[in-house]
Swiss-Prot record:
One of its GO terms (molecular function) is ATP transmembrane transporter activity. The chain crosses the membrane at residues 235-252, 290-309, 333-346, 383-402, 426-443, 483-502. Solcar repeats lie at residues 229-315, 323-408, 420-508. Pfam families: EF-hand_7, Mito_carr. The gene is slc25a25. It comes from Xenopus laevis (African clawed frog). GO terms for cellular component: mitochondrial inner membrane. SUPFAM superfamilies: EF-hand, Mitochondrial carrier. Residues 253-289, 347-382, 444-482 are mitochondrial matrix. This is Calcium-binding mitochondrial carrier protein SCaMC-2. SMART domains: EFh.
Length: 514
């Protein structure tokens, strides 16, 4: 269903520059049949926009501010904005209104005074102008359906021409099936969204979803985010969210490792039985064995993956700010291989610490020292091959499923709302991550068993292929999925906790929520 067309009154559009961005010619208004007193005052059209600073500039802003200041207290609150815009024929959701006030509220008193209001409009128009130019691929001062399709395609979203025309019609006031600068600006006036590509930015997910396996393809960051330092704030927020999430779900993660290594047909370990065994052997605190090193490795792995991803993007020669789906998969998988190769000894330490018995090691350093002395340096790379092979199905299937779900939602709802909402984001991320884990789980199990070989009494030293054959022969295909139940049990709480902590850390670090 197409988005209802927003009829912007002359009072609103009059506060902006009315010059055509290409020719510089003034853009004429059609005077309404029954204009209000305030609108009539703005009917004259000398260039009085925010950026041009014409003679009518200050007066127009004052009149608009007074119209929106419904209770006449010298400030615009969310309720004033809702009522005032509705009177002027502009309808915004409560969430959009909150974002507008938050974006302009410099003193954080929950409302906009005149100076804050002017600053918000000035800043907003500059952003809108930059976005308009980026979408105007033909450089002719107008955006058509093909340019909308191309812009979204560059960001990994494929929509039909019919869908693009629906988006176009929601902004096209004169029926030309193109959008000029004034139509673009008027439509987005006092709207929290700043661009069509922002639809995509809602769908960033790898920094939010931490389910214990950091194998997702990295998110894209815009040039603006890189220049302003927002990229590292996102990574720090994601790392903090991952640390809290992993700590909260650590008992399930340790149970998964125990079942992967010790469960078999002769030792059919249940979830309840596994927890009982851990508590009896080492007490309640033993449920968190291996969690420390699992949290510590988040920072180096995320940093190395991000840097590798950016370098690989340059090597493959992409001049685009964001990559296509296939390029993202290749670059993301290679970045994952580099990051995992760099921190893989920490993966082995995590497995050994999770499997340790009470008193076996004094800590992570003691564990590493004993492995080095007793097994040699090569022990820190046991299970390396299946781990690397697991990156491809995990990252590929997660990306493919997520993009499929994203496109399905956008095809149906993007013309009525850019924001998919928390539930849709969490649901899509959970489903795609679960599918990725399911596909790569046999490789993950073989990796864990190879990492644990020397710590398990009587365990045979096998290559990856021999271990696969041994498991299938002795336990059947089901043996490749030991520990899958606790692994899936932790997905929903892990994703939910990650999201909540991530959003709160973003606010603390000063990252503006989209």
């Amino acid at each position: 269903m197409a988005r209802p067309r927003s009829l912007v009154s002359p009072l609103l559009s009059g506060v902006f520059c009315q010059c055509d961005t290409v020719s510089g010619a003034p853009h004429s208004h059609e005077t309404p049949a029954s204009p209000s007193l305030a609108a009539a005052a703005l009917a004259a059209d000398p260039c009085g926009g925010l950026l041009c600073g014409g003679p009518e500039h200050e007066r127009r802003l004052q009149i608009l501010f007074q119209e929106l200041d419904v209770n006449k207290d010298g400030a615009i609150c969310i309720n004033d904005l809702a009522v005032g815009l509705k009177r002027l024929g502009v309808h915004r959701t409560e969430l959009e209104l909150r974002k507008i006030v938050k974006a302009g509220d410099k003193d954080q008193d929950g409302q906009l005074d005149f100076d804050e209001f002017v600053h918000y409009l000035r800043d907003h128009e500059k952003k809108l102008r930059l976005v308009f130019k980026s979408l105007d691929k033909k450089n002719d001062g107008r955006i058509d359906a093909q340019e909308i399709m191309q812009s979204l395609r560059d960001l990994g979203v494929n929509i039909s021409e019919q869908q693009a025309e629906k988006i176009l019609k929601s902004m096209d006031k004169n029926g030309t099936m193109t959008i000029d600068w004034n139509e673009w600006r008027d439509y987005h006036l006092l709207h929290s969204a700043e661009n069509i590509p922002e639809i995509i930015l809602y769908w960033k997910h790898s920094t939010i979803f931490d389910v214990g396996e950091n194998l997702l393809v990295p998110d894209e960051f815009t040039v603006e985010e890189k220049q302003t330092g927002m990229w590292w704030r996102h990574l720090v927020a994601g790392g903090g969210a991952g640390a809290v999430s992993r700590t909260c779900t650590a008992p399930l993660d340790r149970l998964k490792v125990l079942m992967q290594v010790h469960a078999s047909r002769s030792n059919n370990m249940s979830i309840l039985g596994g927890f009982t065994h851990m508590i009896r052997e080492g007490g309640f605190r033993s449920l968190w064995r291996g969690n420390g090193i699992n949290v510590i490795k988040i920072a180096p792995e995320s940093a190395i993956k991000f840097m590798a991803y950016e370098q690989i993007k340059r090597i493959i020669g992409s001049n685009q700010e964001t990559l296509g789906i296939h390029e993202r998969f290749v670059a993301g998988s290679l970045a994952g291989v580099i990051a995992q190769s760099s921190i893989y000894p920490m993966e082995v330490l995590k497995t050994r610490m999770a499997l340790r018995k009470t008193g076996q090691y004094q800590g992570v350093l003691d564990c590493g020292k004993k492995i080095l002395l007793q097994e040699g340096l090569s022990a820190f790379y046991k299970g390396y091959v299946p781990n690397m092979l697991g990156i491809i199905p995990y990252a590929g299937i997660d990306l493919a499923v997520y993009e499929t779900l994203k496109n399905a939602w956008l095809q149906r709802y993007a013309t009525s709302s850019a924001d998919p909402g928390v539930f849709v984001l969490l649901a899509c991320g959970t489903v795609s991550s679960t599918c990725g884990q399911l596909a790569s789980y046999p490789l993950a199990l073989v990796r864990t068993r190879m990492q644990a070989e020397a710590s398990v009494e009587g365990a045979p030293q096998m290559t990856m292929s021999k271990l696969f054959k041994h498991i299938v022969k002795t336990e059947g295909a089901f043996g490749l999925y030991r520990g899958l139940a606790p692994n899936f049990m932790k997905v929903i709480p892990a994703v939910s906790i990650s999201y909540v902590v991530y959003e709160n850390l973003k606010l603390t670090l000063g990252v503006q929520s989209r």
